[in-house]
């Protein structure tokens, strides 16, 4: 019998013998082949695991826990994940979390590296134009989920947040640019207490308070998820002030970046912060950033890397690197290679500081000028981009394909394997096609390179570089090549099936010996089978590396002498396996750790605190630097001050024995400037010929630089330009005869100069350079029409209207239209025999990008009438809207066309379109007593309604002012007998910056004028967009303190004594408006006080409260201009020689005199930048007593020396020493409600001795939405205003057809009975007195649905009516016996806040009980019926409905439409059958 112990020993020996040879050296790697049914969309490993996820095109999620040896489809609970995963996302900062986003509102999360998945629901599709998930940099359970609704280019983004891994989700807010976390990266604020303060801070890009268009977008934040403060707090991006036009934000390591673009320019401003509190605009040394023309690149812990597009046509850029706070950028590399998507050939070598590889274009001038192909070359930097050198294979230059042509996933060249770098490319003088490339490798971080394999390959690193694999990707193959000696020698193995490799990858840290290869058996997408190979190299070596197999301190960077190099104050080393060691490191998921040794401080360890000097050797001091008190009494003095250098934050260099550039040095007072002297300066320049055309190129907030550019054409067709507001003038096109100047109306940096022939010049950089262009024909000879038309969105799209056959003797001189998409480099014929053509693209009209309207003569003959045509494909085909067209105009969102009435050729018919496709005939009010309408004038429209002036007769120079509803089809009379001149222009002006304020002149003696008398004009003002008008209240005294010649009623204009102003029809220059878009609430005008406007008596008047009160500024006529957003106002005497001007720095409360010339001048005009934000003004005139004749001159008046500091705006936005919060008022109201809301503006206090320096007047807040009052309504169609403010049906006319809305919408249940009122389009009021919604009625055949909607039970009706009678009766009797008894007519429009006595007429205790008492008898008669209904209700037989519906609050309008969720419901507007509530591009407010 065999002993048991012997059996046991025998078994153990056999077991040992039977062990597989895994520990023995194998001749080749092992692999496993698996098939996947559909193409992989996304693939990634969880860090430090062999768990890999693959999302396939059919919506499945595949999972493997062993690196791809075995796969399973994740089905989730009840199999709901199958075929439902649209997007797979990995948490970038947490190695345990991933997210599978579905297509039907069901989404899934894993927090245990895909072992389990938990479903969460959000009824949103993941956003496509914005990040669908936004991650918190420190708390992985906090995520923002984003969905979006897009129309054309515009999206409304709905952001939700979770702080518990989607166990619960809450709405964060709606926005237009998405939301993000302030702590958006683990390195942001990681070393400060700030992280605790801003843990929950979120930032969102939201619409402007009044204008939901991109140029008004705001960046707001909340520390409480916008719960307690729905609007949030606006971020102060620039010098403690908010900025409009914010586009997006990005978290980049320790930096948070926001990009903004103003209206009228492509230039972007980039704002950077490291704490979310203090933001600074990044400076690029005079270089422009443009939209879609910059790329944020992989950055370091101490600087940002940005590539800026310089040549859009050829795809080249400039690489900039910032200082440590991201505020000042220096140029590192010129002519970087980019593709059309903005991808840049730039990559940092992984894990090694300071090594950067870029591809640059070697022939930039040939590419830009000659259209030749780019010659791309590769360069590498070992000193963080300070210097670059070519890559070398022996003595040959090497060029590698980079990011723009990458064919794998992950990094292009490197991995965490220290020092190993690979790439596909070629040697020679430039980079060739990818198909011609070979594989190259370096094992010294790019210092030297060697040829690895023929042909292009996909490649990957494993086991910290101990294994390198490659697979040819230019053909179908099953050959896998590998190297275990850093690419010096290669072996290969043949896999089972040939594939076209799609990706070759491994674990993120490249420490594993396992690789995953994914490929397809077919070259064509979607065909064939998709295969994965899991390849394992663990058996290739028998042993694990020991100490002698390593270089213990392999230097990561070498200097030019081959010695370890210093960067950021230290040298970097790694412990690395020797290339020829026959072992594997086999330390899976253990990342190689760098070893640092400190260096002595050198100049490279310091940076400029502000920015480099022009020579690049030193540092400029910041403009805010002031010398110590008592120093710098004169420019030659010196003082001890900062050097301008600082040690780069995070730099670890040793100061002892090194350089210390940040020590204080002796500074010259001349370089920091002397304090402002409080004086005004003037500069006079003379012209040989009179300037006849002068225009400003306005600078926007996002424009860099500080130029104030003026363009001039003189009478002898010479062109001049000034960049310093007329202090100096240049002639860049000297000798050229320039006779037309055309500014691009949508891009303020662009202007065109035209000659009489086919040649012209343009500038796109505000006149610093001019380039020639040619036109297909000479410009049109119609002098009243500009030859160029511009596209609102694309600045290079032009339409040219030129004169054809005008030099021939055929007599067929006509105009043809051509279009260009490349700023005139080439032209194509659009239409022949046109009068004009215009682009009609608008944000208000979705899909209108290619919409063009043209006026063309029928049958291409000038003797035939005009047709109005439109096309969306450049007239490959077209739509004919009207024959016998007279004219058409575009105003705001409306297109208005007038054509001859077929039934009466002497009359015109007006039509309107909102969408550019469908026109509707305008319905004029019946009280418009003009039988034959011969002329219309389309007036300014910025409030979602058209103001139209209709000529009263063929000879009359006046006519009614009518106003449309929000789609331009139905008009009501606003005001009669508005003055016009012979040219048809009307005395009508909207106040800039304030909603609804308009000033007009009316003819006060129409009957006498019709008999030949002279017109007597009266000035009237409206504060609610033409719904109500009043005479202007006169000041009590004139400028000299004397009384006027009529009896002034304080605060009110009367027929015998009011203020009258000279208006639009009398102006020399239509640009000289009463108001300014930046000087909110202010107007200046010339006029007089009396019963009508005088031709002879005229003084200058000013208001600073929107026209409610006026004061006399100075006696006599003056021209005026505003500066610095109203903080300085300048007056110059008009039509008389003078050498003096008058200015005010306190909104006209006081005036100072300044002598600007040694001799008197006849001043023809005073100008400044259109935004009125400059501190410079320009006088245009002639010297009157010059020895050499009356010299033509300009005089620059510079006020910048008057003040030394910028006004300070407190962080909390409240009023302070420099600013007040100002609310526009309505003269007939006491609650500051205008258009249903209260607005607040920041306005400088008149006595604050500082400058605004604010280019954009900013609405601080919409304080609240108000209850509706009469001021929120105007008279409806067929109704006319009465003397008491009410609206009454015009006698003999029927009520409007209110049921029409039911016919237009078959699903509609009810409609509102006509009340005589309609809401002012821009009002946002809620509740209160809704004059337009008094009573509803059921639509025909919808009585049952109506009753079901509005009915209440008998019990409810009993308690709603009977119970309050006792209380109401008691209070009513008490009021009746003690009130004054004056129950008179209730006048519409009288406020409820004039008296606060509880028994006054306006007291609710009086008005409400009286109404109830009046109904007592009717209620009493209803009691038996009610009792019966209660019984029936309880018995379940019938339900009695109420006879009247609930008046729902009116919804938001216009710009408030984007603020979804603010209002409870939306009321359909019977008038708005043609379109939706449109956005107003022409609004000036943010």
Curated annotation (Swiss-Prot):
* Residues in the Cytoplasmic compartment per record: 1372-1407
Glycosylation sites per record:
200, 301, 967, 1265
Localization, per the record, is: Golgi apparatus, trans-Golgi network membrane; Prevacuolar compartment membrane
Q: Summarize the protein's role.
A: Functions as a sorting receptor in the Golgi compartment required for the intracellular sorting and delivery of soluble vacuolar proteins, like carboxypeptidase Y (CPY) and proteinase A. Executes multiple rounds of sorting by cycling between the late Golgi and a prevacuolar endosome-like compartment.
Q: Name one GO cellular component term.
A: membrane
Instruction: State the source organism's domain of life.
Output: Eukaryota
SMART domains for the chain? VPS10 (SM00602)
Give the membrane topology, semicolon-separated if more than one.
Answer: Multi-pass membrane protein
Query: Which residue positions does the secretion signal occupy?
Result: 1-23
Main subcellular localization, coarse class? Golgi
List the source organism. Aspergillus terreus (strain NIH 2624 / FGSC A1156)
Membership in a protein family: Belongs to the VPS10-related sortilin family.
Which gene carries the instructions for this protein? vps10
Q: Which GO terms describe its biological process?
A: Golgi to endosome transport; Golgi to vacuole transport; protein targeting to vacuole
Provide the alphabetized UniProt keywords: Glycoprotein, Golgi apparatus, Membrane, Protein transport, Receptor, Repeat, Signal, Transmembrane, Transmembrane helix, Transport
> Which residue ranges does the entry give as Lumenal-facing topology?
24-1350, 1429-1486
**What is the protein name given in its UniProt record?**
Vacuolar protein sorting/targeting protein 10
Transmembrane regions listed in the UniProt entry: 1351-1371, 1408-1428
What InterPro entries does the record tag this protein with?
A: Sialidase_sf, Sortilin_C, Sortilin_N, VPS10, VPS10-sortilin, WD40/YVTN_repeat-like_dom_sf
BNR repeat residues: 63-72, 380-389, 440-450, 482-491, 720-730, 761-771, 818-828, 1101-1111, 1142-1152
């Amino acid at each position: 019998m065999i002993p048991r112990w012997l059996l046991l020993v025998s078994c153990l020996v056999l077991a040992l013998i039977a062990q597989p040879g895994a520990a023995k050296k194998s001749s080749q790697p092992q692999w496993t082949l698996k098939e996947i049914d559909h193409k992989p969309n996304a693939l990634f490993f969880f860090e430090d695991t062999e768990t890999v996820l693959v999302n396939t095109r059919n919506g499945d999620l595949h999972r493997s826990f062993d690196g791809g040896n075995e796969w399973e489809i994740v089905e989730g609970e009840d199999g709901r994940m199958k075929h439902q995963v649209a997007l797979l996302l990995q948490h970038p900062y947490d190695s345990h979390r991933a997210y599978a986003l579905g297509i039907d509102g069901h989404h899934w999360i894993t927090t245990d590296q895909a072992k389990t998945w938990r479903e969460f629901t959000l009824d949103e599709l993941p956003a496509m134009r914005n990040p669908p998930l936004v991650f918190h940099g420190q708390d992985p359970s906090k995520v923002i989920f984003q969905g979006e609704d897009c129309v054309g280019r515009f999206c409304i983004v709905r952001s939700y947040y979770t702080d518990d891994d989607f166990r619960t989700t809450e709405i964060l807010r709606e926005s237009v640019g998405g939301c993000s976390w302030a702590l958006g990266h683990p390195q942001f604020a990681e070393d400060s207490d700030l992280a605790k303060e801003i843990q929950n801070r979120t930032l969102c890009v939201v619409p402007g308070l009044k204008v939901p268009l991109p140029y008004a977008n705001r960046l707001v934040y909340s520390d409480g998820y916008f719960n307690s403060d729905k609007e949030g707090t606006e971020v102060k991006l620039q010098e403690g002030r908010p900025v409009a036009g914010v586009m997006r934000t990005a978290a980049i390591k320790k930096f948070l970046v926001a990009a903004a673009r103003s209206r009228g320019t492509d230039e972007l401003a980039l704002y950077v912060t490291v704490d979310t509190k203090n933001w600074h605009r990044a400076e690029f040394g005079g270089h422009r950033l443009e939209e879609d023309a910059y790329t944020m690149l992989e950055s370091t812990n101490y600087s940002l890397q940005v590539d800026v597009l310089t040549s859009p046509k050829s795809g080249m850029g400039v690489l900039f690197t910032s200082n440590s706070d991201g505020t000042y950028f220096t140029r590192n590399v010129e002519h970087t290679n980019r593709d059309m998507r903005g991808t840049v050939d730039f990559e940092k070598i992984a894990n090694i500081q300071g090594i950067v590889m870029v591809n640059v274009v070697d022939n930039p001038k040939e590419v830009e000028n000659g259209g030749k192909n780019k010659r791309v070359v590769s360069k590498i930097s070992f000193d963080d981009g300070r210097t670059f050198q070519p890559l070398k294979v022996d003595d040959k230059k090497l060029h590698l394909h980079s990011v723009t042509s990458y064919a794998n996933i992950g990094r292009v060249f490197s991995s965490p394997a220290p020092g190993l770098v690979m790439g596909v490319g070629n040697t020679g003088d430039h980079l060739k096609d990818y198909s011609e490339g070979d594989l190259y490798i370096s094992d010294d971080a790019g210092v030297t390179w060697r040829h690895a394999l023929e042909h292009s390959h996909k490649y990957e690193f494993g086991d910290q570089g101990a294994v390198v694999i490659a697979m040819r990707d230019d053909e179908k193959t099953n050959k896998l090549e590998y190297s275990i000696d850093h690419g010096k020698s290669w072996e290969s193995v043949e896999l089972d099936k040939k594939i076209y490799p799609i990706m070759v990858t491994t674990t993120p840290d490249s420490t594993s010996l396992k690789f995953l290869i994914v490929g397809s058996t077919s070259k064509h997408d979607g065909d064939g089978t998709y295969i994965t190979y899991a390849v394992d190299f663990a058996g290739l070596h028998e042993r694990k590396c020991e100490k002698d197999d390593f270089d213990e301190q392999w230097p990561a960077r070498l200097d030019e002498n081959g010695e370890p190099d210093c960067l950021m104050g230290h040298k970097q080393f790694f412990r690395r396996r020797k290339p020829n060691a026959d072992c594997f490191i086999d330390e899976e998921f253990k990342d190689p750790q760098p070893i640092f040794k400190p260096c002595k401080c050198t100049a490279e360890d310091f940076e400029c605190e502000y920015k480099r000097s022009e020579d690049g050797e030193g540092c400029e001091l910041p403009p805010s630097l002031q010398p110590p008190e008592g120093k710098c009494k004169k420019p030659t003095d010196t003082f001890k001050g900062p050097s301008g250098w600082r040690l780069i934050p995070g730099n670890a260099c040793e100061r002892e024995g090194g350089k210390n550039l940040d020590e204080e040095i002796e500074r010259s007072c001349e370089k920091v400037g002397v304090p402002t002297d409080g004086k005004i300066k003037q500069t006079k320049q003379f012209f040989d010929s009179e300037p006849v055309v002068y225009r400003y190129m306005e600078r926007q907030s996002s424009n860099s630089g500080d130029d104030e550019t003026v363009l001039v054409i003189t009478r002898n067709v010479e062109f001049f330009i000034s960049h310093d507001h007329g202090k100096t003038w240049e002639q860049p096109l000297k000798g050229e005869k320039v006779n037309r100047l055309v500014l691009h109306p949508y891009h303020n940096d662009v202007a065109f100069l035209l000659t009489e022939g086919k040649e012209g010049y343009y500038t796109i950089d505000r006149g610093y350079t001019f380039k020639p262009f040619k036109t297909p024909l000479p410009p049109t000879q119609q002098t009243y029409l500009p030859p160029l038309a511009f596209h609102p969105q694309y600045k290079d799209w032009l339409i040219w209207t030129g004169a054809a056959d005008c030099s021939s003797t055929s007599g067929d001189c006509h105009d043809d239209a051509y279009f260009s998409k490349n700023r005139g480099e080439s032209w194509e014929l659009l239409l022949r025999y046109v009068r004009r053509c215009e682009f009609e693209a608008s944000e208000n009209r979705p899909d209108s990008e290619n919409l063009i309207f043209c006026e063309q003569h029928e049958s291409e003959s000038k003797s035939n009438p005009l047709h109005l045509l439109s096309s969306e494909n450049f007239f490959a085909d077209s739509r004919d809207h009207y024959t016998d067209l007279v004219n058409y105009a575009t105003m705001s969102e409306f297109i208005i066309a007038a054509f001859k009435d077929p039934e009466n050729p002497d009359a015109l018919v007006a039509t309107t379109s909102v969408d550019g496709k469908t026109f509707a005939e305008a319905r004029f009010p019946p009280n418009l007593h003009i039988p034959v309408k011969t002329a219309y004038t389309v007036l300014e429209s910025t409030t979602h309604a058209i103001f139209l002036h209709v000529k009263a007769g063929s000879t009359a120079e006046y006519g009614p002012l009518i106003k449309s509803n929000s789609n331009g089809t139905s008009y009501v009379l606003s005001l009669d007998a508005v003055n016009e001149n012979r040219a048809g222009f009307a005395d009508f002006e909207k106040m800039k910056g304030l909603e609804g304020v308009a000033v007009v002149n009316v003819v006060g003696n129409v009957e006498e004028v019709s008999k030949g008398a002279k017109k007597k004009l009266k000035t009237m003002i409206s504060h609610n967009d033409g719904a109500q008008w009043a005479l202007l209240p006169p000041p009590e005294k004139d400028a000299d303190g004397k009384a006027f010649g009529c009896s002034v009623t304080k605060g009110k204009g009367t027929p015998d004594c009011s203020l009258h102003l000279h208006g639009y029809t009398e102006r020399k220059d239509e640009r000289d408006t009463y108001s300014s878009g930046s000087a909110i609430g202010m107007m200046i005008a010339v006029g007089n006080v009396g019963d009508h406007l005088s031709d002879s008596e005229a003084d200058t008047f000013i208001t600073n409260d929107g026209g409610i009160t006026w004061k006399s500024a100075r006696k006599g006529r003056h021209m005026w201009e505003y500066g610095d957003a109203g903080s300085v106002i300048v007056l110059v005497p008009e039509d008389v020689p003078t050498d003096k001007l008058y200015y005010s720095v306190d909104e006209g409360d006081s005036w100072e005199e300044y002598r600007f010339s040694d001799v008197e001048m006849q001043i023809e005009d005073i100008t400044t930048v259109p935004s009125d934000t400059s501190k410079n003004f320009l006088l245009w005139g002639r010297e009157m007593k010059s020895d050499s004749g009356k010299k033509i001159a300009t005089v620059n008046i510079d006020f910048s020396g008057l003040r030394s500091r910028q006004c300070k705006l407190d962080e909390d936005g409240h009023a302070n020493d420099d600013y007040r919060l100002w609310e526009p008022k309505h003269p007939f109201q006491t609650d500051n409600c205008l258009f249903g809301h209260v607005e607040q503006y920041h306005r400088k206090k008149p006595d604050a001795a500082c400058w605004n320096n604010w280019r954009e007047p900013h609405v601080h807040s919409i304080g609240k939405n108000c209850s509706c009052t009469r001021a929120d309504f105007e008279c409806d169609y067929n109704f006319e205003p009465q003397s008491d403010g009410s609206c009454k049906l015009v006698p003999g006319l029927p009520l409007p057809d209110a049921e029409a809305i039911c016919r237009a919408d078959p699903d509609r249940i009810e409609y509102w009975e006509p009340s005589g009122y309609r809401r002012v389009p821009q009002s946002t009021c809620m509740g209160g007195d809704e004059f337009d919604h008094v009573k509803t009625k059921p639509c025909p055949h919808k009585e049952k649905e109506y009753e079901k909607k509005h009915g209440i039970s008998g019990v409810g009706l009993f308690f709603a009516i009977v119970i309050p009678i006792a209380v109401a009766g008691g209070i009513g009797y008490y009021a009746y016996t003690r009130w004054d008894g004056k129950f008179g007519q209730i006048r519409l429009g009288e406020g409820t806040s004039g008296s606060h006595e509880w028994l006054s007429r306006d007291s609710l205790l009086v008005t409400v009980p009286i109404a109830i008492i009046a109904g007592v008898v009717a209620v009493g008669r209803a009691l038996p019926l009610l009792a019966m209904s209660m019984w029936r209700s309880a018995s379940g037989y019938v339900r009695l409905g109420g006879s009247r519906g609930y008046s729902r609050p009116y919804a938001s309008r216009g710009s408030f439409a984007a603020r979804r969720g603010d209002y409870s419901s939306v009321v359909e507007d019977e008038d708005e059958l043609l379109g939706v509530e449109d956005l107003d591009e022409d609004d000036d407010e943010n």
